[in-house]
């Protein structure tokens, strides 16, 4: 959601997957792009995604002008833009290693050479699922690449972070767990209560 519009992927047999938007009042439904956008990150009036048709560069969509513009030349996947020029992405050319760059300075820095399935950035930490056939794990590092810590062995998905907890789902059992953001380590099964 950006402003008063919800952006979503639409599928039909004629055009396959395309990007649409609709107003929060249910009006103003319109196609935004013929191209499939797998993941994106929002900041202000913009959302950011990697290219999916001709390249893997970083693109910025302006929700005011309805224009998509290439803003950074790389081969990225799952970009997260956390500031005007501050970008994290998985570098496809480095087997999905996590990279940070400042777009205006154009000095990409590899934060970890682990092959990464998914990640989330919160404050000064990055939480990620390390891909490995032998040693997959949920891990964390500072946003400068230091202070590596393995939180849990195995395969996890849906990494979501709040001010005091990190939530994630065991891929096999579908059990949701959480751990503290202030002292991550001990995993606790999450059992949501029933609203009364």
Where on the chain are the PLM-derived regions?
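Repeated scaffold domains used in trafficking and secretory/extracellular systems
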Residues: 1-3, 34-44, 73-84, 113-123, ...
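Structural motif
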Residues: 14-21, 53-60, 94-100, 133-139, ...
């Amino acid at each position: 959601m950006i402003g008063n519009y919800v952006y979503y992927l639409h599928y039909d047999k004629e055009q396959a997957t395309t990007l649409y938007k609709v107003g929060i009042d249910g009006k103003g439904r319109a196609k935004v792009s013929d191209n499939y956008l797998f993941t994106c990150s929002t900041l202000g009036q913009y959302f950011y995604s990697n290219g999916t048709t001709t390249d893997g560069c970083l693109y910025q969509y302006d929700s005011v002008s309805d224009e998509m513009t290439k803003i950074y030349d790389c081969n990225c996947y799952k970009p997260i833009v956390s500031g005007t020029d501050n970008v994290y992405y998985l570098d496809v050319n480095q087997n999905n290693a996590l990279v940070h760059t400042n777009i205006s300075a154009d000095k990409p820095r590899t934060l970890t050479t682990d092959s990464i399935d998914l990640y989330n950035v919160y404050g000064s930490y990055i939480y990620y699922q390390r891909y490995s056939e032998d040693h997959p794990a949920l891990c964390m590092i500072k946003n400068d690449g230091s202070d590596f810590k393995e939180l849990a062995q195995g395969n996890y998905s849906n990494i979501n972070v709040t001010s005091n907890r990190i939530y994630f789902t065991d891929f096999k059992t579908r059990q949701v767990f959480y751990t503290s953001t202030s002292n991550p380590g001990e995993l606790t099964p999450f059992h949501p209560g029933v609203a009364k």
